[in-house]
């Protein structure tokens, strides 16, 4: 038997007294930011867990880099869809972008494609053919909306779909 335990995190916007600087803090303790990571106060930026989901270290690192670029006058914006998530199980589970439920809730007309790893020469050669890859596409623009991968090294493979989303591939 195996058990996966995931622990939660809580934002601390009130604990750091961000309101004293005029920064808006939600009831839950998050600090809202726009896609350039700006708070409601000019020249105050927010990054990391305190600005909301997903609460992942690699998201915070990416946000910090983007905030520095924006402060330096470069054109940059944060798109949470490009932050992948991975469950380090066996086999691994990785996903990024929109899920089917999110696409439906947003009224997006989408199509999906899936590929079973039992048909993958690489997976068969590795002796690990359990798994699959699933992609969601906008039905009209044919642009990638999201991806999910279950299988060995899924956490590494998901980065290829992130690149496709960032580049606006269709």
Can you say where each PLM-predicted feature lies in the sequence?
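Short beta-strand-initiation
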Residues: 3, 82, 130-132
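FAD-site-proximal beta/loop scaffold in flavoenzymes
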Residues: 2-71
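Solvent-exposed alpha-helices and their adjacent loops that cap or buttress functional pockets
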Residues: 38-39, 43, 79-80, 125-128
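Short amphipathic alpha-helical segments
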Residues: 43, 83-84, 145
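A conserved FAD-binding loop/helix module that cradles the flavin
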Residues: 47-105
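Flexible, glycine-rich terminal cap/loop adjacent to redox cofactors
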Residues: 72, 88-170
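Short, glycine- and charge-enriched coil/turn segments that flank and shape catalytic ligand pockets
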Residues: 22, 27, 73-77, 106-109
């Amino acid at each position: 038997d195996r058990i996966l335990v995931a622990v939660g995190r809580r934002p601390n916007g009130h604990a750091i007294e961000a309101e004293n600087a005029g920064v808006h803090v939600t009831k839950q303790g998050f600090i809202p930011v726009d896609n350039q990571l700006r708070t409601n106060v000019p020249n105050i930026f927010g990054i990391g867990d305190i600005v909301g989901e997903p609460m992942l270290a690699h998201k915070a690192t990416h946000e910090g880099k983007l905030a520095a670029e924006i402060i330096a006058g470069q054109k940059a914006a944060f798109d949470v869809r490009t932050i992948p998530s991975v469950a380090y199980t066996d086999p691994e589970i990785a996903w990024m972008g929109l899920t089917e439920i999110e696409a439906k809730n947003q009224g997006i007309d989408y199509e999906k494609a899936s590929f079973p790893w039992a048909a993958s020469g690489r997976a068969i050669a590795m002796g690990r053919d359990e798994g699959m890859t699933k992609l969601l596409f906008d039905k009209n623009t044919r642009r990638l909306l999201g991806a999910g991968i279950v299988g060995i090294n899924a956490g590494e493979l998901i980065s290829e779909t992130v690149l496709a989303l960032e580049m606006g591939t269709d």
